[in-house]
Amino acid sequence: MYTQDQLKAMVAEAAKDEVLKNMAPGGILGVGTGSTANLFIDAIAPHQSHFAGVVSSSQASTDRLQKHGFKVLDSNSVQSLPMYVDGADEIDPQGHMLKGGGGALTREKIVAQLAQSFICICDGSKQVDVMGKFPLPVEIIPMAHAQVARELEKLGGVVTLRKVKGADSVYVTDNQGWILDVAGLSIKDPVDLESQINQIPGVVCNGLFARRKANVLLIGEAAGVRRQTY
Ligand code: 5RP
């Protein structure tokens, strides 16, 4: 039986193989955020000459990539990326994802939107029939937090303003936004809910990646890494 950390390491390794096999040398790679993405960064580090550069989805990933010596490019300088590799907090049978547990949802969505192919890497615990057990992160403009929270409550969620782990201060994103975590949703139509939440004034982005879903899933299970396409 593998531990969750071992499963994450296995999918990170599989993603390295997937990228090196399918991406022509000299291309630019999109890189996600989180503990699984960190393992992926470490796995591709010895192969960085394969890439002209990378586009990163958070300051944390940028720091890690630069420590390894990667050339991190501004997303504005890139028109398209062949691949974007990132983790997820939940993924449903259609490849719709719920992301943002690490707070990087907005930049993740921006980089994912540039990519021709989204490679989702996660351990088996992230695969669900219906998303919503993991609280849905919504990045907001701070001055709107109370009114956005009221609107999200109307959708049936229990809303919490994210705080820094182990502290009482409000968690601030790389974009100087705040995050509302919405618990208790049963997300049967993620494409519709993603659009609906985006319509609330003060919302910057929400953690549903349904309109731009995964193209390839590499999932770590008891039998090893399983590859699925959507
Ligand atoms: C960060 C994310 C991550 O991809 C998601 O939280 C999964 O993280 P981990 O790989 O640590 O389980 O969306 O904003």
Language model segments and positions:
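Active-site catalytic pocket residues across diverse enzymes, especially alpha/beta-hydrolases
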Residues: 44-48, 69
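Short helix-loop-beta connector
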Residues: 19-27
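Conserved phosphate- and dinucleotide-binding cores of soluble alpha/beta proteins
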Residues: 2-10, 20-21, 59-230
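Glycine-rich beta-strand-to-loop/alpha-helix junction loops that act as flexible
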Residues: 28-36
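Short active-site oxyanion
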Residues: 26-29, 47-54, 96
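Generic hydrophobic alpha-helical segments
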Residues: 11-19, 40
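Small/polar loops that bind or transfer phosphate-bearing groups
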Residues: 32-33, 53-57, 140
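N-terminal active-site wall of soluble small-molecule enzyme domains
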Residues: 35-44
